[in-house]
C-alpha cells in the first residue's frame, strides 16, 4: 500500500479495498485517518498535507469514503464528462 489507513476495522477495509487500490494506482499517496469520535474519516492526499494536518476531504462514514474514492478514479480517467453547454 502506497498510503496508509489508520484505525479502520477489517470490514471497513474490505468495503473500500477495490476503490482504494484503484485510487492508489491513479494518484499514489493517500492517508486515511479515523476521526477520534464518530464514524468519519479524514483523507490526506500528500505527505506534506498529512504532516501539516491539512486534510483534503472529510468523509462522514465508510460508504461516503468508498464513493469519494470511486469518484476520484472516475474523474481521473475521464469517465465523467462535463456538460457541453451551447450558447
Q: What does each model-found stretch correspond to?
A:
Residues 2-28, 79-83:
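Negatively charged, low-complexity tracts enriched in Asp/Glu with abundant Ser/Thr
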Residues 8-11, 47, 58, 85:
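Serine/threonine-rich, low-complexity intrinsically disordered segments
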Residues 23-79:
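Acidic, low-complexity, intrinsically disordered interaction modules
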Amino acid at each position: 500500500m502506497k498510503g496508509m489507513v489508520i484505525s479502520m476495522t477489517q470490514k471497513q477495509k474490505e468495503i473500500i479495498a477495490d476503490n482504494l487500490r484503484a485510487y492508489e494506482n491513479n494518484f499514489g499517496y493517500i492517508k486515511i485517518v479515523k476521526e477520534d469520535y464518530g464514524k468519519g474519516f479524514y483523507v490526506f492526499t500528500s505527505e506534506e498535507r498529512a504532516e501539516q494536518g491539512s486534510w483534503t476531504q472529510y468523509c462522514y462514514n465508510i460508504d461516503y469514503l468508498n464513493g469519494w474514492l470511486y469518484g476520484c478514479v472516475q474523474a481521473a480517467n475521464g469517465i465523467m464528462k462535463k456538460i457541453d453547454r451551447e450558447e
